[in-house]
Amino acid sequence: MATYQPYNEYSSVTGGGFENSESRPGSGESETNTRVNTLTPVTIKQILESKQDIQDGPFVSHNQELHHVCFVGVVRNITDHTANIFLTIEDGTGQIEVRKWSEDANDLAAGNDDSSGKGYGSQVAQQFEIGGYVKVFGALKEFGGKKNIQYAVIKPIDSFNEVLTHHLEVIKCHSIASGMMKQPLESASNNNGQSLFVKDDNDTSSGSSPLQRILEFCKKQCEGKDANSFAVPIPLISQSLNLDETTVRNCCTTLTDQGFIYPTFDDNNFFAL
């Protein structure tokens, strides 16, 4: 991966998020459930400054609820505990420590081997480099007064375009939450309150578009599973739903953009919220 300049030379984003937490006409339990099951692009500053208005309630930042979040940043430090690692990640607005558990049976032995020259020996630690960019997905929690990302999925970033794209998503969603932009899905979600998706004119099934079928299939497959060790591959979706892989890939991209699923091991495997 190419070497980049310090993150704060590029980053000026200080806000973001998908949902406006103010009540709107017609809002209710279904809208609350939608927020809980939606991935929100944020900055680390938003995570650190978020507050709980009520005990055990959702975290709120910039007029929006934060449940599952994603953010990008630079790895500043790696602490290897063989069975898990702690990554210190900074994005120009703040710094946070994220723990990732290893699934590799050889990590206990490899943890004492520093022959790689990087100061850490486990297989999970060698997936990351100090100074490299990563994207983090997970549930926002707090333990002992400290913000944590639970069930964290951490993906190395190979292209700086992904960092810029994330910043644009944060700006867009912050604008929606603050009322400066309209929610793009608002007109679709207000269609009798039945669907968040625009109807697929090419759909020939009984009332379900490929987008909806893929989301329902992914949710069913991911129920009770851990995103660190399980994902739904595109070929499985294609074979199970009798859809061509191009259609599945395009739908997965749309669902990712909408915050309902996210890529895990690579861009061909997804986990549903």
From Swiss-Prot:
DNA-binding region: 69-157
Modified-residue entries (Phosphoserine), positions: 27, 122
Signal sequence residues: none
PTM characteristics: Phosphorylated in a cell cycle-dependent manner with phosphorylation increasing at the entry in S phase and dephosphorylation occurring at mitosis. The N-terminus is blocked.
Region Disordered: start-end pairs: 1-38
Cellular component GO terms, alphabetical: chromosome, telomeric region; condensed nuclear chromosome; DNA replication factor A complex; site of double-strand break
Compositionally biased spans, kind Polar residues: 1-13, 29-38
UniProt KW keywords: DNA replication, DNA-binding, Nucleus, Phosphoprotein
Cystine pairs: none
Subunit description: Heterotrimer of 69, 36, and 13 kDa chains. The DNA-binding activity may reside exclusively on the 69 kDa subunit. Interacts with MCM10.
Role: Binds to single-stranded sequences participating in DNA replication in addition to those mediating transcriptional repression (URS1) and activation (CAR1). Stimulates the activity of a cognate strand exchange protein (SEP1). It cooperates with T-AG and DNA topoisomerase I to unwind template DNA containing the simian virus 40 origin of DNA replication.
Protein name (Swiss-Prot/TrEMBL): Replication factor A protein 2
Gene that produces this protein: RFA2
